Each structure stands twice: as C-alpha cells, then as structure tokens.
C-alpha cells in the first residue's frame, strides 16, 4: 500500500515548495524506496500549454506528452524517474472532467458541488497515481498558498485522504517563510503561526514545518514555532538559501528529515545512500572556471521560461568542471547593425525554443554568426528551424525562405504545418512527448548518443519541408536524425564545422544530475576543446 506526503506552502508564494518536495523524493529514493510525484495547480487553465511564458515560465513535457508545470522538471531531475500526465493536474482539468461528466449524465441528475464532486475528482487523481505507479510513496505538491480561495478544494481533498488513510499513511509537510527583521535584528514567527492556524481551520495539522530563510534558525525560535504550531521541535526543519538547488537534499538529510518521514509512515527503507548526491556536489565545488554562452531567446526577461535548458547547461558544465556564465541576448534587439558586436567573444551560442514571429530575424543572425565564425552552436526546436532557414537564405540565396508560421506567402516554405495537425485549436494540438529518432550512421549526433537512436521529447506543430532536403544537402547541411514513421526531420548538423547541431526535439527534458543529455554534453565539450 502506498504512503502519501502532501507539501503545502504558507506565508508567501515562491518559497521553493517544488525543491522541497523534490528533495524529499530524492532522500526517499536514496533510502531504497520507489517514489512518484505530482503537482496540483489551482489555476483554471486545463494545462499550461497555452499560457504565456511570461505568465507561467517553462512548459515541461512528460514522456507521454503532458504539458505541465516547470516543477515537474525539478521532480524528474531530483528523483531520476520519468513522470506522466498523472503528475500534473489543474483546477481547470478537474472542473472540466466533472462538468463533462455532468453533461453525459454520469451523476444521475444530482446537484454538482465542490464537495463531494470536485474533491472526489482530486482524490481520484492521487489514488490513481498510487495505483498506476505502484510506488511506495506518492509526493503531491499543492500549488499556491494556504488561505488562497483557489486552493481550498485541494486542501479539503487532502484532509479527507488523511481521514481515510490514517496518520501512519499520510503526512503533511508545510513550507513557510521565517521572517528576519534587519531593523530590530530578530526573527518573527507570527506569520508562520497564522499560516498553521489557517491550515488548522481547514482541518489539517502539519507534521513537519520547513522554514525558509537565509540562515539557520536559533533553538529558541524553533521552540517557539514548535509550541505555538503544535509540531515537535525535531520536526522544525531549516531550509536555508543555497548557491545551488542540488545542495538542498544533503542539507535536509543532515537534519534527518528522511528519518522523520520513514518513522511516521512506517516505511520499510534501507540505510540512506547519498553517495551520488555527494559526488555531484563535489563536481559543483570543483567547477570554478567559467565558460560564457550567448543565450539568444525571446523570453529572456523571465529566465524560468528556459528553466530546463539552463539546468541542462549547468549539469553539462559541471561534468567538465566548468561553471556556466550566461550572456542573455534579447533576440528582437539583434539586427544587421549590431549582431557582430553583441555576439563577439561568444564561446558558444544557443538558440532555444519558442513560438511566434517576434525575434526570428535576430535568432537567424545569431545562427549565421556561429556558422560563419565556427563557434559551437546548439539549436533547440525553434533554434533548429531558424538555423535551417538561415542556411537556405545565406547559402542558397533564397532571400524569402521562411516558415509558414512567420510568412504564409513565402515561395520557399522550409517549414510548414505537420500533416494532419489541428490548425484551429491551440491547446493540446502539438506533436508532444517522446518519439524515436533514427540517427544516421557516423553522424556527429550518433556519436554523441553512442547509438543509432535517440529517445527525446517534443513540443512543436511545424516540420521541415522535405522538398528542400537535396538543395540544403548540396550546401553542406546534413539531416542526421529522422522520425522514420512519418519521415520528419529531427536533427540537422554541419559536418564542416566543429559543432553546429540543432534538434527539433527538446533534449533539456531528459538531463539529470550526473547524467547530462548527450547534445548538451557534446555542446559543452566542443566549447571546452575550442578554448584550450
């Protein structure tokens, strides 16, 4: 029978509930337990797939094509497990399923209410995750802050789960902000007390309180929190600021958080083995020399829009004992008059994914600069498309070469809608999830993967137009990765250059600590070797 841990947040949002939940998952997995994780978001969107990156940040894609919250990227990287659509549920998805059921008459004419119908649907997602994953522990993060009106159905649902399953099977971890007032030089615990009281008014008593702060809390402060929040002092855990999120599991392990959980939930665990985490942290410690990468994107004002790409770069850098320094370049501010000066001294250039016309010309200039100066280049999704279009314009002299996404009237549509895709609806209509890419023998990408196939995830609705393959091959572009089932181009490269590789798929979604994705590892290796 699965055990359940629910992670909630109080006082303010943005405290790092996702990192806390991920770290708990990492500690339990290091204790020999099978872990599954999920996120409940209170917003009414069905999923984040149609949300602006400025509103939501990155859309993380699961292996089965779920468009999910960026916290799932943390989950997968920390517990090194592939999650599914079951790992991401929104209020919108819950309400939609309940209302659709009502329209079909499955409720036998009953009045549809938040309790029990919405709460039952939420509980079903939790129990379904336990059944399908067969995990020892299900860790569920509840988005938002306790007290938010949007979160109340989720709080009520997890209260009911505790009632149904018992304290020995359900645990509540509450993440809060411990305030430090610099003027009076003292900690203030009242916001924590009020947050716990708000939870108590909803029928939930936290078992563990995780205090976010920039330094360890004194014993008397922990005693005060323990007294007024009715939580044992041993269960008041410090979560202090770290220079890397990958230090958090070790910091929590030092406070025996895993033992507290294992004891309450009566889990049959092994002695914890943190050797991989310690090894990874040693890599971080030894990475002092910087390499600078120009990151040419559309949404750089919100770096969370590229979270998995950034983490993948860091992970690959640490593999070579290098610290990654990002030079942020706003794509729509690059033009013919300034791109050479802006990109001068770049050790590597990366163009990530995105949608829409804005910034496209600047991205093409970045791709051209990398190609003409033999600077290692990695293009992802849109970055692959603009690299290919740039080659068509510059080397084939097709000045109007484009994608029909940006110019429906182009006479050289290098990229067009994927055949059979829904053009009328936006949500859930992309080519999504893990696909098998066949890699061409002796290509650079096949050497990087050390295989003739790559299993990577996708999120796009435009594909390369195969009518132009021979023309582009004639100027040196190699089509080294193909989705054979539908003859979709997945990877292109320029063999004449040190490293010029671009993929339609998103390799950032499969990077893990100690296991960088081959494309990122190859990209960083090329930069290191190019700067010896």
Swiss-Prot record:
Residues that bind Mg(2+): 71, 141
Catalytic residues (positions): 381, 506, 508
UniProt pathway: Pyrimidine metabolism; CTP biosynthesis via de novo pathway; CTP from UDP: step 2/2
Keywords, alphabetical: ATP-binding, Glutamine amidotransferase, Ligase, Magnesium, Metal-binding, Nucleotide-binding, Pyrimidine biosynthesis
Top-level taxon: Bacteria
Positions of region (Amidoligase domain): 1-267
Name under which the protein is recorded: CTP synthase
Organism: Mycoplasma mycoides subsp. mycoides SC (strain CCUG 32753 / NCTC 10114 / PG1)
Gene that produces this protein: pyrG
């Amino acid at each position: 029978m699965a055990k359940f841990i629910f992670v909630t947040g109080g006082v303010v949002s943005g405290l790092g509930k996702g990192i806390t939940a991920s770290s708990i998952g990492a500690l339990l997995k290091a204790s020999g337990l099978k872990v599954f994780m999920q996120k409940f978001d209170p917003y009414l969107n069905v999923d984040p797939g149609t949300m602006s990156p400025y509103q939501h940040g990155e859309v993380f894609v699961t292996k089965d094509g779920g468009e999910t919250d960026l916290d799932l990227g943390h989950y997968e990287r920390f517990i090194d497990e592939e999650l599914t659509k079951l790992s991401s549920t929104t209020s919108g998805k819950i309400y939609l399923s309940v209302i659709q059921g009502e329209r079909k008459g499955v409720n036998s004419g009953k009045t549809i209410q938040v309790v029990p119908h919405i709460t039952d649907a939420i509980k079903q997602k939790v129990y379904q995750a336990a059944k399908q994953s067969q995990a020892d522990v299900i860790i569920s993060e509840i988005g938002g802050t306790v007290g938010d009106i949007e979160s109340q159905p989720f709080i009520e649902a997890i209260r009911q789960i505790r009632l149904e399953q018992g304290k020995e099977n359900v645990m509540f971890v509450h993440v809060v902000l411990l305030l430090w007032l610099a003027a009076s030089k003292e900690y203030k615990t009242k916001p924590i007390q009020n947050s716990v009281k708000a939870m108590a008014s909803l029928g939930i008593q936290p078992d563990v309180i995780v205090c976010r702060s920039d330094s360890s809390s004194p014993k008397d402060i922990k005693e005060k929190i323990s007294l007024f929040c009715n939580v044992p002092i041993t269960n008041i855990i410090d979560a202090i600021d770290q220079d890397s999120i990958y230090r958090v599991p070790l910091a929590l392990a030092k406070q025996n958080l895993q033992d507290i959980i294992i004891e309450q939930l009566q889990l049959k665990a092994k002695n914890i083995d943190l050797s991989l985490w310690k090894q990874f942290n040693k890599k971080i410690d030894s990475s002092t020399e910087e390499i600078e990468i120009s990151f040419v994107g559309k949404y750089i004002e919100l770096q969370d829009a590229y979270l998995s790409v950034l983490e993948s770069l860091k992970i690959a850098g640490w593999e070579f004992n290098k610290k990654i320094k990002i030079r942020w370049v706003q794509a729509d501010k690059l033009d013919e008059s300034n791109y050479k000066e802006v990109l001068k001294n770049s050790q590597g250039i990366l163009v990530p994914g995105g949608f829409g016309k804005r910034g496209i010309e600047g991205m093409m200039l970045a791709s051209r600069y990398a190609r003409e100066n033999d600077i290692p280049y990695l293009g992802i999704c849109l970055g692959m498309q603009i690299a290919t279009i740039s080659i068509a314009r510059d080397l084939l002299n097709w000045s109007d070469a484009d994608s029909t996404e940006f110019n429906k009237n182009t006479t050289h549509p290098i990229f067009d809608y994927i055949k059979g895709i829904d053009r009328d609806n936006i949500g859930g209509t992309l080519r999504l999830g893990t696909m098998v890419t066949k890699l061409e023998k002796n290509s650079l990408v096949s050497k990087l993967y050390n295989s003739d196939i790559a299993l990577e995830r996708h999120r796009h609705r435009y594909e390369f137009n195969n009518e132009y393959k021979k023309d582009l091959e004639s100027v040196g572009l190699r089509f080294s990765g193909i989705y054979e089932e539908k003859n979709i181009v997945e990877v292109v490269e320029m063999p004449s250059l040190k490293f010029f590789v671009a993929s339609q798929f998103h390799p950032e979604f499969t990077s893990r600590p100690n296991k960088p994705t081959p494309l990122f590892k190859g990209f960083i290796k090329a930069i290191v070797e190019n700067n010896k």
